[in-house]
Design a protein with these regions (language model features):
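Short coil turns that delineate tetratricopeptide repeat
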Residues: 33, 67-68, 98, 162-163
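Acidic, Ser/Thr- and Gly/Pro-rich intrinsically disordered linkers and low-complexity segments
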Residues: 100-122
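Canonical positions in the second alpha-helix
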Residues: 27-28, 61-62, 93, 157
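Start-of-helix register in tetratricopeptide repeats
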Residues: 3, 37, 72, 120, ...
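"A position-specific structural signal for the A-helix of alpha-solenoid helical repeats
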Residues: 7-8, 41, 76, 124, ...
Length: 188
């Protein structure tokens, strides 16, 4: 039952029907209070609606119920927290993303699906690293090694996205060549 509620809530969230998504998530939590995924989804929807206290409570409950799971919960908690606590949440999320990226690199299966998963994880990891770097520019700017940490994190994030940009440019050039090859010649 709660799986159906969460699936419907995800569809509502994707179509920006936040009121219905929130109602469905609350129903899922009420039906299954020990379901970490239901609490995580409730937290995500609450963030979208601006209910920050309820979001934090739901996300914390999700983490209490199971430490395993997606990095999103930790990244959201990093956004909601301040200073060192924010850093701890973000670092946990980044650790999960690193593990997921490594697993995607060594996984077997459908090539396009694996590439899509790896790409999505790599982009999320780069964003997470930038979020931590931003902390060292703001809340943690007075830490002794803030500048070095910020620089290292930003550099790591750039190293992750550079190959992605090269692949994008290569695909664009291939599409352009293909278009030119199939374009009929016209006389002027």
């Amino acid at each position: 039952m709660e799986t159906e509620l969460l699936s419907e809530a995800r569809r509502c969230l994707d179509s920006l029907d936040l009121t219905k998504a929130l109602s469905l998530c609350r129903d899922a939590v009420a039906h299954s209070p020990a379901d970490a995924d239901a609490h995580a989804m409730l937290g995500e929807v609450c963030l979208q609606t601006g209910s920050l206290e309820e979001a934090e409570s739901a996300l914390l409950r999700s983490v209490e119920l199971t430490a395993s799971g997606g990095a999103g919960r930790y990244m959201y908690l990093g956004q909601l927290a301040d200073g060192p606590q924010s850093l701890q949440w973000y670092e946990r999320g980044v650790d999960i993303l690193r593990s997921q990226r490594s697993a995607a690199e060594s996984a077997s299966g459908e090539r396009e699906e694996l590439q899509a998963r790896w790409l999505e994880t790599t982009q999320a990891l780069a964003i997470g690293l930038c979020a931590i770097a931003e902390l060292y520019l703001s809340d943690l700017c007075f830490e002794a090694d803030a500048e070095e940490r910020c620089e290292a994190l930003a550099s790591e994030a750039l190293d992750l996205v550079k190959p992605l940009e090269v692949k994008k440019r290569k695909k664009k050039r291939e599409r352009e060549r293909e278009t030119k090859r199939h374009r009929p010649w016209t006389l002027r």
